[in-house]
Amino acid sequence: MGARASVLTGGKLDQWEKIYLRPGGKKKYMMKHLVWASRELERFACNPGLMDTAEGCAQLLRQLEPALKTGSEGLRSLFNTLAVLYCVHNNIKVQNTQEALEKLREKMKAEQKEPEPEQAAGAAAAPESSISRNYPLVQNAQGQMVHQPLSPRTLNAWVKVVEEKAFNPEVIPMFMALSEGATPQDLNTMLNTVGGHQAAMQMLKEVINEEAAEWDRGHPVHMGPIPPGQVREPRGSDIAGTTSTLAEQVAWMTANPPVPVGDIYRRWIVLGLNKIVRMYSPASILDIKQGPKETFRDYVDRFYKTLRAEQATQEVKNWMTETLLVQNANPDCKNILRALGPGASLEEMMTACQGVGGPAHKARVLAEAMTQAQTATSVFMQRGNFKGIRKTIKCFNCGKEGHLARNCKAPRKKGCWKCGQEGHQMKDCRSGERQFFREGLASLQREARKFPPDNNKERANSPSNRELWVSGGEDHTGDREGRKGEDRELSVPTLNFPQITLWQRPILTVKIGGEIKEALLDTGADDTVIEEIQLEGKWKPKMIGGIGGFIKVKQYDNVIIEIQGKKAVGTVLVGPTPVNIIGRNFLTQIGCTLNFPISPIETIPVKLKPGMDGPRVKQWPLTEEKIKALTEICTEMEKEGKISRIGPENPYNTPIFAIKKKDSTKWRKLVDFRELNKRTQDFWEVQLGIPHPAGLKKKKSVTVLDVGDAYFSCPLDENFRKYTAFTIPSVNNETPGIRYQYNVLPQGWKGSPAIFQSTMTKILEPFRKNNPELVIYQYMDDLYVGSDLEITQHREAVERLRSHLLTWGFTTPDKKHQKEPPFLWMGYELHPDKWTVQTIQLPEKDTWTVNDIQQLVGKLNWASQIYPGIKVKQLCKLIRGAKALTEVVTLTREAELELAENREILKEPVHGAYYNPDKELIAEIQKQGQGQWTYQIYQDLHKNLKTGKYAKMRSTHTNDIRQLTEVVQKVALESIVIWGKTPKFRLPVQKEVWETWWTEYWQATWIPDWEFVNTPPLVKLWYQLETEPISGAETYYVDGAANRETKLGKAGFVTDRGRQKVTSISETTNQQAELQAVLMALQDAGQEVNIVTDSQYVLGIIHSQPDKSESELVNQIIEELIKKERIYLSWVPAHKGIGGNEQIDKLVSTGIRKVLFLDGIDKAQEEHERYHSNWKAMASDFNLPPIVAKEIVASCDKCQLKGEAIHGQINCSPGVWQLDCTHLEGKIILVAVHVASGYLEAEVIPAETGQETAYFILKLAGRWPVKVIHTDNGSNFTSATVKAACWWANIQQEFGIPYNPQSQGAVESMNKELKKIIGQIRDQAEHLKTAVQMAVFIHNFKRKGGIGGYTAGERIIDIIATDIQTTKLQTQILKVQNFRVYYRDSREPTWKGPAKLLWKGEGAVVIQDNGDIKVVPRRKAKIIRDYGKQMAGDGCVASGQDESQDME
């Protein structure tokens, strides 16, 4: 492809590079345009080699021209490029692309006027112009139309389009362009090449079948034979190419008159592609809205792209364009578009909205005003760009020459851009001269405002209130004295200063050399530049870098400028500037500064949880000294703007109290935000853990900073502040309490950490980009700054960081600014080449409480990350169970020994190394015994990066290899978090042992790289189970049973050799009895044994090959297993009549299991234990008397708490469902109830969003006929996504009454029922989502009651089946009523009627005649359709009508 760059050489290449892309533009054609064109030609299935000659270019242009109307912008650009190349080959001189296209059109017209003789002859031979001249049908030398197969390039281009565009709207015009003139066979070839998209092709196939059937209905086949020489008429399947040959297709397309089967088939395919595009691009045109920061051009692009995918008529699309395009624009653009008036063209809209980007436009202005650069940023232009005469351009917005409206710096104007009036467009303007709507601002209306006395507080409250201050000036309001001596926060000037808010451009009226002008105060500009002003004195010529390049200006020195009553003398430049600018050379003289409140950061919006209100917790009494301390603290906080006083209109309250700080006489204010935290929305933690020093790279220079008053520097959402209200009471209720609310993030509120972290990240992001040489670790208010710079450069960079943070209101106190090692950071101690944890002192105590042990274990866990060998298992055993914090515990001998060992380990300081990315990570694991493990991660031997321990027993019964795999997983995860990769493992286990375990028992696919290290004690499997029965060994059938009430049980075995043994046990359970039976069998058996059990519990324990357990009984079984040479364990289902199992079952059940004279009781009890079915379901399924079934429910400890659920039914339509979200265990459960039947669908969803809810609704609609859904007014249910899903599935959505649970009665009661069932079976499932599905199953199929005594599952099926039958019957009735009956009475021979047919049977019909219902034999009745009023009698229709032809 690169060879295409040599299309032009020598002089022609020079000529090519002199041609402009656009008239009046700056860019010219370059070599890269030729390379691009050759690649595009390959995409459009054309030969790039044709570009080398003029004739080739002409062929390509003829090929591409028919597709221009439907083609994309890329196709037009390619055509334009080839047109210019054609002119260069033919030495036609052109200046730009437009001229090349005009020359090409002239040449084509000339060729049409003077056709060549051969062309004329060809035209005479084939006069019909409708025949396709494009491929694949071409005319041979004899004048016949022959088929030319599609080229591989065309097919390749089509495949690329589908793969790259993935069925977005652009696929349709590309298909039209590539399939021009194709036959149905060619079109099928194109479709077959993208057969991988089976779903799309199936949809396309369905559309084609429907269109083919419609064609057949509209074009019936003519009867009789086809005349000789005439082609048969195509059927729908012929057009689709399935039942027609290529020759027939060509004949139809070239006949006279032609039948364009190719074009018809293309239309069908386009209909199908429209449907596919709609599916693959599900965004509705209603959802396309302009973002607040989105440019109008991008919004229009998205709008029309989505509009192309909409399946609607052109009239509807026109209406969408006229209404929705303006309606869904952002407020800034909407104002401009409405000012243009109705009927404005898209071009006028695009022109008017150039450069407008909502808040982005404001942000650009703000950024411009905040720029503090010391030197001007000049934009230099290439000198070559001044060659030649260029057409001058004029701005629509300000009327000045030299720039376009989108680059205009002047304020954007509303209304007509010619006269300034609103209500008409510029094209309709009748005014002759321009008037600019900003002229009214020339007077001094923009008077400086004064702050109210408490404005300091207000500025802290509103982070959006950024101000430009002019210091020390006279106030135009007349109050020249001002307020002196008042306290100022963050060096804010005295309150009589004028202010100019920066939410609009700071344009003021100024006096320059006696003339009044409007000018922009620009703190980012060095110089002051004014346009069209006559100043006295001499001037010097000067060139400055301005907007759009260099501009020539006149420099006047010692000019007097008056701004807001302040005078200054300096240099003024006069020249063609788009907007008058007052630069820093004058602003610094008058003391103009940029000032910020506490935080210029945008607040993050916060809401309460749906349906909840703020906290209303009463303030508890406080002592006098605490009230005094809180009053002082709050007074200081109010001065600083962190809190504000509020009145009685705020109904919310949170209690506060005070505690003394550690080792201090000062008090600390605490707010009990527990109730507010429950009611506040959930937040996503921005940072999932704390950074670890082992992951730090070694740096030459390091600094540690701390952000002071971190939370109090971040503003709280204004709408949320009222919920943080608190009250300081008075002693003996002497006066009403003083009420405050927070303006900043409060300590103890659940949202503060996440919002602060997010805010700090946004603030540091630009600094990180501008200073890539610095590594900044940020966790809450701790900052680690490292670099490889020299110490002086590093400290300069740190000072820049501190200044950057201060700009945003974050201070970094000197007392916590650590410049020299060791650095104390995040509980660690950092040295230049090593790290350790901060010094740990273990307390010496005679008596230990639970709280003491908890703190001790916390310290040891912290130390274990660098001190290898730390153990805490025995200490943790001391505080198992629910114990009070102050309860005294006695150290066991093992715990004392463990603590003594840990003290010894901590005596010698241990240090960790820093991470080197160039070296390999190695993790070594050792077994310490008693289920405890230790590990080290290092790169160089004896220089650990990090150490750790592991002592978890994830299951009651485990073995060393399972624990080792858990340690490996923990270390791998830890390594990924800290270093982003997994280490190579060195494990104390032999390859054979490890591989045996992994292949036989471990269900996992990921195995890390590891090698064997011979570090005793080695891990091994102590016994192994056989996978097949052992021939010749005795087989033991084991079983156990226990009575729940008496706790008495039996365990025993029966062998295949006739031996048996049964033992009675006290204080046992079924599971313990089953284990006891296995132990008895193992103790009785020889070295080889087969054991058969019916207990999945026993099978699960022994199959996991444990070598240790917390159960003494299981430990005894393990000892017996180790003694055996070979063991085979098998499971059989209970109560299925299996010989040995049934025999032992009867033996151990005697006198243990209850017998209530009915065989089904055991099964019912077993089912109830599993599903907690209600008594009606058990009585029905197991044929139990109601009293017995109720006794089973009553004896269940989980079902007797709240009694039996009351079932009732609401008489509703079969298609009505109620949906609601409920919460359990911190998770969200979306519940749907079929109101008529009580049938339940529920699912745990990851988030309460519209997307998840819509997906659930679509799944529900795919399973059941859903006509109406009834929901509350939650944000997820009212979202556009849910509305779109309901629209697509044709579901009507209804909403309940806000905060009224009765309007959602069915689903609300079902929420309680579902939670109750989950509570009964929760211990059977590990995850909540499993428990939810189990509870749904139980409710739908294991609980009977309500209408019909059905389960909910049976009831919904019955209701739907009945509804279908009723509908069908109703249809039949309506069909029957379309007939009329003429009948004869037995006594009279004349025909009577017509009567209304009510029912038609085999031997008689039921009719209604004049209100009387009669039964008439079929032989005396004639049934006919109701064709209107007929006369009965001789020769009437009734006498000759055959009913069998009219009615089935």
Curated annotation (Swiss-Prot):
Residue(s) carrying Phosphotyrosine? Y135
| Lipid-binding residues (covalent, N-myristoyl glycine) | G2
The entry marks the following residues as binding Mg(2+) 2, namely D1039, E1074, D1094, D1145
The sequence motif named Nuclear localization signal is recorded at 26-32
Residue intervals of every Integrase-type zinc finger in the record = 1159-1200
Positions annotated to bind Mg(2+) 3: D1220, D1272
- Please name the GO terms that the record assigns under molecular function: aspartic-type endopeptidase activity; DNA binding; DNA-directed DNA polymerase activity; exoribonuclease H activity; RNA stem-loop binding; RNA-directed DNA polymerase activity; RNA-DNA hybrid ribonuclease activity; structural molecule activity
Q: Where is the Integrase catalytic domain?
A: 1210-1360
GO BP, one annotated term:
viral translational frameshifting
The active site consists of: D522
Question: What sections of the sequence does the record tag as coiled-coil?
Answer: none
Stretches assigned to the Peptidase A2 domain: 517-586
Residue spans of biased composition, Basic and acidic residues class: 107-116, 446-460, 473-490
- PTM text: Specific enzymatic cleavages by the viral protease yield mature proteins. The protease is released by autocatalytic cleavage. The polyprotein is cleaved during and after budding, this process is termed maturation. Proteolytic cleavage of p66 RT removes the RNase H domain to yield the p51 RT subunit. Capsid protein p24 is phosphorylated.
The reaction(s) catalysed by this protein are: Specific for a P1 residue that is hydrophobic, and P1' variable, but often Pro; Endohydrolysis of RNA in RNA/DNA hybrids. Three different cleavage modes: 1. sequence-specific internal cleavage of RNA. Human immunodeficiency virus type 1 and Moloney murine leukemia virus enzymes prefer to cleave the RNA strand one nucleotide away from the RNA-DNA junction. 2. RNA 5'-end directed cleavage 13-19 nucleotides from the RNA end. 3. DNA 3'-end directed cleavage 15-20 nucleotides away from the primer terminus; 3'-end directed exonucleolytic cleavage of viral RNA-DNA hybrid; DNA(n) + a 2'-deoxyribonucleoside 5'-triphosphate = DNA(n+1) + diphosphate
Residue spans annotated as Zn fingers (CCHC-type) read: 393-410, 414-431
Locate the region Disordered: 107-129, 446-490
Identification of the protein by name: Gag-Pol polyprotein
**Species this protein is from:** Simian immunodeficiency virus (isolate EK505) (SIV-cpz)
